Amino acid sequence: MPTGYHNFCDDELDESINFNYNRKPSQPKDYDDDSRTSGRTTPKRARGGRGRGSGDRGGRGGSRGRGGNGGSSRGGKKNGWRDEKPSLLSSILNSRQHASENREHMFNKSLRGAEFITFIKSAEVYDPSKLLKDVGVTVEEANVVNEVEDIHIIVPEVIPEVQDVTGADAQLEDQESEDEEVVTTITETYADDGDNQEDDDDEMLVDGNGQLVDDYDDDEDDDDEDDEIDEEVDDDLIADENAVDVSTLQDAINEVANDTINDDRKEEDPSEGSEADDEEDEAAEFVMDTEGDPDMVDMEFMETDFAYLNKKKRAEKSRTPLTSSTAVISDRPVASVSADTTLVGSVASKKRHNADPRAVDIPEYNSDIDPEVLKDYIESIKNEDEGSDAENIDWIRSALGTQLGGTEQYYVDSDDSENDDFDDDDEDDEEEYEWPENGTVGCIRNIVATRAASQGYQFMVEHTLDADMEEWWNEDLIRDSVAEHLGVSVSELPDEAYRWYVTRLGGDIEDPDLSEEGINYSDYYDDSDEDEKAREASEMDSLIQSLIDDEVDDRKALMDHGYTPPMTKSRGKNQVPNFGVNDPELQAQLEKHWVNSRAAKRAKREQRQAMRKQGMFTKEFKQGGIIPLHAKYPILMTVEEARKEIEIFINAPNKPMVLDFPPMGAEFRSVLKKLSACYHLKPDIHGVQKSKHVSMLRTSRTSCHNNNYIQKFHDKFPKKFKLVIRNAKYSTEQYLYETKHQKGSKRSAVRVHNREGEIVGHEAPAIDDSNIGRLLLQKMGWTTGEGLGAQSRGISEPIIAKVKISKRGIGA
């Protein structure tokens, strides 16, 4: 296909390459013989197959391909379509400018209406890499010009060191610009997405006059670039022989930019600085007093912000001059401060008129309180803390005459002078004993719990004998441990020492002085409770006596009052018990009732057993009144019984459809199958493992008049042939009884039963001559018939074995 651009035009056409899609060609082409069989020569579309090719291009597929009526795969004339004019679709797809130049002409007019297409060869071959290269050069030139212009504007105003580097001296400029040409290399890196990816960095050369010198071969592009750079670059820029340090320039630019930003802020509000200066002069100066407090000399304070959400105030704070390298801003605003006051770690805050409503105002300190009053109040609080409640408790005791801290309130004898010094005596006793350093008293480490028992207290003890176990110890064991710790005997152990150590170990025992024995009752004591208890006891005795003389049924009331009836004497089976009644008539009446109740219970029990055997307690009998066979025959069933059950099933008035037999073994199930065939019943097996049983279904031919079949069945299986049932009490003996008659079973072999006293093993063959043991004996000198042992004193005949069934023997 020719390379270049195509134009839709009608003038100045080349007749050699013009063709029309709406007409037949004026001069038909001559094709080879293959074209006649492969495709059609007419311009009509091919109809056969799934092809899309026309007559001019020939078929492009086979019989099932994309061609015409089924020809060769490439068409008629070899390379015919390549030598002829290209199609309209291929020319559009391979054109580079059809979308931009001819979009309106192509899509607004019908493609069938375009009569002529002219292909004109372009002046030069289309090269995409050349276009990308031109674009890259243009971008690079623009970047270099901008960089040089920025350096010229910023550098002279920064620092003298940079001016010397860039050659800002006017004398050097006049001398060196005339004599020689100084070239400065400026490197600019850019991403090239074209085909030329090998050169990532392009170097641009700048001479003394500000002209750029590059290494491109195109002279026309160089002239255009030089003209643009001459117009933008200033003549004052003179490059040094060495390359410019870009990092130094960047730092200088950043510093100048920061100064410019600060100047702009001052220009926005010129009056703000003067007002701030006036307020600072009027306000008191605050000094960071870190020398007065030695603890704050080396302390580093954390910078914090105010709790007010006000952008304007934050801007003012950021521009506030700091008195030191680190400023500490307090979160609490100061309401009023005098000139003599020195604050540490705070800065004077201005009065906020437009504060955020969410800000919390902290109340200021009220300085109107008298310092002496405040001092007295603090001392009184300290005095209250130093005192204890013991003095108050003693005062209340003396005033009320009562003991505090117990569960009961009782009066104390006022004449007893020892109660006044009760606490002092305890303190003296506690000081007499010493607590061991290891915290172990004897073998006791700790008392976990305490409980009261009938014979004293019991303690849950952790001891050194077994650290992983806790045991309940009585008071005797605790006293032994305490006495062992003190080095005295148990009889010499004081009770005060025992209570002191038990309390320190964690035990909770009651002080004997506070128990009932130590209570001194006053004149207010009343014994009315004892009289009431005695009255209740007499009433209970009379009630018990009256119930003893009454009937046996009324003795239940005695059980509610804790009465236990007398134990009856031992008696034999079915003997009347002794009721312990002195009245002979009552005794005879009780014996009669007992005999009758026993007889009634026995009769009822026998009746229930009979009904259970008949299957009347089963679910089937309760629902439908039918006794199941597994309940009726729990162990055995004969063939005659099975035949009768089948006849009852067939002649039943309600005509049930299914008859279920009890679970049986495989041999007995096969017998029932043969029996069902005599009555034209359909047998079926249900259940799994030991619960497999035979179910007989009624059919249209079921009847009881097949006497010939029944007689033949009984000839093989007699009427007394037993069918073993597998019930809940199915035992191993029943299983053996089932399996010993089965064919192919190992149990069907005849067993050898030895009788009592029978000799066994006498027919066993002698040891062969090839036996290793016999060979060893022969080498040692033994011969056949000779006894074993030294000098042949051993037995020469084997020991006789006799069967003993009645006894098992010693060690069995």
UniProtKB/Swiss-Prot annotation:
Localization annotation: Cytoplasm; Nucleus
G-patch domain residues: 769-812
Lineage: Eukaryota, Fungi, Dikarya, Ascomycota, Saccharomycotina
Start-end of Basic and acidic residues biased regions: 27-37
Origin superkingdom: Eukaryota
GO molecular function, one term: nucleic acid binding
Species this protein is from: Yarrowia lipolytica (strain CLIB 122 / E 150) (Yeast)
GO biological-process terms attached to the record: mRNA processing; RNA splicing
Feature: compositional bias, Acidic residues: 190-205, 214-243, 269-284, 413-435
Gene: SQS1
Protein name: Protein SQS1
